[in-house]
C-alpha cells in the first residue's frame, strides 16, 4: 500500500499537517473552489518565484495565506510592492480580506516540489532526462537527504512509445509513517508532448517519543 498511495496524504495527521486549515458546513464546496482558485492564481502569477506550497487559513470574513518560497525577494518586490499588488488581486478574487505571509525555504534542494519543478524546467530546455535526474539527485543528497527517488514519464528523448525511467539513491521507506518523506509532481511541456516528473525525498525520521527524551534527560 505504501508503494501506491501519495506519501504526503498517508502521513497527514501523523507527521504532516493540512495545507487548508478551516472548517465549513454548507459552505464547504464554495470554500474548496475558492482555495483552488487562490492556489491556481498564485501558481501562475509567481511561476518564476520558486513557490513550494500555499497554506490557507480562514476566520470569519478573513483569509490568511502563507506562501512558502525559495525567492522571497521576488514575491515581496521592491518596498513590498509585489506582495501588496498580489494581496489586492486576491481581495478582488475572493471578495474577502486577505492577509499574506511569506516564509523562506532555506534549502531548496530538500523540497520535493522545487526539485520536481527544476527537473521539469531542465527537460523543457532540452537537457537529457538522465542527466537532469542524476545531477539533481546528487545535489539533493549533498544537501543532507537520506534518500531520493525521481521518475520521468512520457515520450523520453522523442521516442514513439512512452515509458518511465527512475533513478534513486539512499533509502526511501514509503511504509514507515514516522519517515519524513516529501513527495511532489510536476509537468514539462516539450515539443513531443508532456513529460511527467515525480520526486520522493527522505529527510530522516521524526516523532521522537517524549518518554525517551525524558529518560535521556535523567
Curated annotation (Swiss-Prot):
PROSITE patterns: KH_TYPE_2, RIBOSOMAL_S3
Domain KH type-2 per the UniProt entry, residue ranges: 38-106
Keyword Iron listed: no
GO cellular component terms listed in the entry, alphabetical order: cytosolic small ribosomal subunit
InterPro entries in the record: KH_dom, KH_dom-like_a/b, KH_dom_type_2, KH_sf_prok-type, Ribosomal_S3_C_sf, Ribosomal_uS3_bac-typ, Ribosomal_uS3_C, Ribosomal_uS3_CS
Keywords from the UniProt entry: Ribonucleoprotein, Ribosomal protein, RNA-binding, rRNA-binding
Molecular-function GO terms, alphabetical: mRNA binding; rRNA binding; structural constituent of ribosome
An annotated GO BP: translation
Keyword RNA-binding set for record: yes
CDD domains: KH-II_30S_S3 (cd02412)
Family: Belongs to the universal ribosomal protein uS3 family.
Reported function: Binds the lower part of the 30S subunit head. Binds mRNA in the 70S ribosome, positioning it for translation.
Quaternary state and interactors: Part of the 30S ribosomal subunit. Forms a tight complex with proteins S10 and S14.
Name assigned to this protein: Small ribosomal subunit protein uS3
Organism: Bacillus subtilis (strain 168)
Gene transcribed to yield this protein: rpsC
Amino acid at each position: 500500500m505504501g508503494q501506491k498511495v501519495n506519501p504526503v496524504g498517508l502521513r497527514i495527521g501523523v507527521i504532516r499537517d493540512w495545507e487548508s486549515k478551516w472548517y465549513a458546513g454548507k459552505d464547504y464546496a464554495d470554500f474548496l473552489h475558492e482555495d483552488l482558485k487562490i492556489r491556481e492564481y498564485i501558481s501562475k502569477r509567481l511561476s518564476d518565484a520558486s513557490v513550494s506550497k500555499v497554506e490557507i487559513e480562514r476566520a470569519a470574513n478573513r483569509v490568511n495565506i502563507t506562501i512558502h518560497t525559495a525567492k522571497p525577494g521576488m514575491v515581496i518586490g521592491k518596498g513590498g510592492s509585489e506582495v501588496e499588488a498580489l494581496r489586492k488581486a486576491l481581495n478582488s478574487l475572493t471578495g474577502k480580506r486577505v492577509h499574506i505571509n511569506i516564509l523562506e525555504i532555506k534549502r531548496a534542494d530538500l523540497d520535493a516540489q522545487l526539485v520536481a519543478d527544476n527537473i521539469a524546467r531542465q527537460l523543457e530546455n532540452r537537457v537529457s532526462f538522465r542527466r537532469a535526474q542524476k545531477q539533481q539527485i546528487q545535489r539533493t543528497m549533498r544537501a543532507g537527504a537520506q534518500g531520493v527517488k525521481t521518475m520521468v514519464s512520457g515520450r523520453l528523448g522523442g521516442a514513439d512509445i512512452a515509458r518511465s525511467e527512475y533513478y534513486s539513491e539512499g533509502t526511501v521507506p514509503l511504509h514507515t509513517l514516522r519517515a519524513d518523506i516529501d513527495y511532489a509532481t510536476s509537468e514539462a511541456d516539450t515539443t513531443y508532448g508532456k513529460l511527467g516528473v515525480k520526486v520522493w525525498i527522505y529527510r530522516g525520521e521524526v516523532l521522537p517519543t517524549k518518554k525517551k527524551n525524558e529518560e535521556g534527560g535523567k
